[in-house]
């Protein structure tokens, strides 16, 4: 199971995965292409459900002038989140997910917004800088 929600008030994207969802997410990263659909999550009034996650490999030039290798773009109009990563970012995400897969079944991924403005950013697009993994109790994923 995978749930992904976006909170405009606190500016964060939260991904909740159980083991099956984690394996789907890892397989998506390994393929370096494609989309992963998310079911509508239980939301409060300040949460927006995000329907799909698309992982897009990009060249290192996309991140020139920055000190990171993973970007996450949220499109308000299409309710889509896109992860962009170069080779180093791809390795970082694989390492994190492999570590979590070995140590626990349930977790959520919290992506913190950055003020970095990319060339692709519009009024409907937000840029997220970093992805951090936190353990999550089993009751979170049903």
What kind of feature is each model-predicted range?
Residues 1-142:
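Positively charged, low-complexity terminal tracts
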């Amino acid at each position: 199971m995978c749930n992904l929600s976006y909170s405009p008030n606190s500016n964060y994207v939260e991904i909740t995965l159980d083991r099956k969802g984690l394996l789907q997410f890892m397989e998506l990263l390994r393929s370096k292409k494609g989309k992963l659909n998310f079911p509508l999550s239980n939301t409060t009034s300040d949460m927006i459900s995000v329907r799909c996650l698309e992982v897009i490999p990009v060249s290192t030039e996309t991140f020139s002038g920055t000190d990171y290798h993973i970007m996450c773009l949220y499109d308000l109009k299409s309710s889509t989140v896109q992860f962009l990563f170069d080779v180093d970012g791809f390795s970082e995400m694989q390492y994190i997910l492999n570590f979590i897969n070995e140590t626990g079944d349930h977790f959520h991924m919290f992506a913190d917004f950055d003020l970095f403005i990319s060339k692709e950013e519009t009024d409907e697009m937000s840029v997220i800088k970093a992805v951090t993994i936190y353990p999550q109790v089993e009751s979170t994923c049903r």
